[in-house]
């Protein structure tokens, strides 16, 4: 007898795999949480940081991050010492030479360097360099003020980044060398600002030097006092307008200018006078009158009436007993009373510095126009 048929057991239902979120969804969720950090208040951020530091899995998280960094981090090439910036060195040397910046280390030459005037100017009280020193002092003050602001901003930003990296080193691995590398990177970025500041300062100093100290600059006029002193000496010594070195120093002291300026003024004045003598006759008359007034004021009262005029008088014809009086009288006659039919008298002293007009051959020996200037000068 056949065995009874057994019912077929039902097949088990297929297992459903658990639904997993796509990988992109997790990444976007993490990024969204990171972006939400900026919207948190300071209290919320401090609370989250405290919760993370107190979490029992913090050490495990730090170990995983160290392992990941060791596998994927790109090795950073650290330089022992960055090469110095050649442009910054040139700018520093220029600012130091012009007296704008101060040397970092002061040695034996500090005393000698402190006595020198900034910018290579001599230690004189001449008017020519007073404006230059005042402007240079303003540039120096602005430079040090801006440099101090730059250094303060660089220190504050560097300190902020260093503190931030130290805070992050509690969660992720950050080495000391990486902190130093980040600080050097920040300072190199700030050096561009320092370079621009020093470049602008050097340009300002060079512009100042070209305006005040360049030999090719526009000629500056002397003061009225200096001009009067020089002109008075020139016209009172018209026969020999070549002052000695002692006289130049005295004129420079009276006019408040330098000896070199006195020498240049006399050289230019002699050239201009020889080129256009007639133009300077009025000026010569004015300064000659000043010189004669000073001469009369210095003489005794008893002699002033006899020596104050070149015309014949009670003291005899042409009573001139002094060589300077002869020169003064002849110059006055030459400029104020030119003879008719003759020529004006011209000085012939000091290697004919001023060429005289030729004497007419027909002039008699007794004419006033044929007066022998050399004999009078001697």
Curated annotation (Swiss-Prot):
Subcellular location(s) of the protein: Nucleus
Keyword ATP-binding belongs to the record: no
GO molecular function, one term: DNA-binding transcription factor activity
GO cellular component assignments: nucleus; XY body
DNA-binding positions: 215-277
Tissue expression profile of the protein: Almost exclusively expressed in testis.
Extent of Pro residues compositional bias: 1-15
Keywords noted in UniProt: Activator, DNA-binding, Homeobox, Nucleus, Transcription, Transcription regulation
Boundaries of every PBC domain copy: 22-214
Protein's name in the database: Pre-B-cell leukemia transcription factor 4
